[in-house]
Amino acid sequence: MNKNFYDSNVGAITKYTNVFGEELFILPCIAGTYAIGAINKDCRLRNMSLAVLQSFVYAEVASAGLKVLTCRTRPSDSNIQHPTSDIPKWQGPFATFESTSFPSGHAMRSFAVATTVAGFYPEKTWVGIVSYSMAALCSAGRVVSEEHWTSDVIVGAALGYFIGRGVVKFNNKIGNISSVDIQAIATNYGLGFVINF
């Protein structure tokens, strides 16, 4: 197969599948679904949107923390491809902020979101199928485009899944998250928050 033909087609496909793990795609989708839920007075859709935001934030923090602690080089790094390269694939904690391969943030975010969405609509099988398919396409695209090693994507997807499951379980426990009341309190001793649910 012609490498240029393969690279150009894979690049075109992964450009569209990577978007499912992008912050600039996920955050407007969360805002949009919350707005639709508010306009239609759909409490479950509003709750799901807030839970997806929780999952997104947890996945983002976990991904950033692990990337800084592992400092793994990406497969697309031209230096790592050279057989005589002195650059190790794992550089260790805080070695560099340029080696951010492990884990895949796209996979973690997309699976955290997919798991949360599917968890709020367990009776609608198609919701889970569509959500997990989008997450899987995003994750596979990261490997195919040589942005991540396969292990980066597998670990990112697994962590995203468990983050999403945890958020769904927590939200099922507290019930209607949109009824949560958060108040800021300012005193002479400092600032604080009170959360009532």
Where are the language model's segments positioned?
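Membrane-embedded catalytic cores of phosphoryl/pyrophosphoryl-handling enzymes
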Residues: 80-196
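Short helix-capping/hinge motifs at transmembrane helix termini and TM-loop junctions
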Residues: 40-41, 70-71, 122, 146
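Interfacial segments of alpha-helical transmembrane regions
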Residues: 36-62, 66, 128
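Topogenic and prosegment regions of secretory-pathway hydrolases and membrane enzymes
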Residues: 1-18, 37, 41, 68, ...
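Alpha-helical transmembrane segments of integral membrane proteins
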Residues: 24, 28-31, 48-51, 55, ...
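N-terminal transmembrane-helix/juxtamembrane module of multi-pass inner/ER membrane proteins
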Residues: 1-33, 68-86, 93
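Hydrophobic alpha-helical transmembrane segments of multipass integral membrane proteins
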Residues: 27, 31, 58-62, 110-113, ...
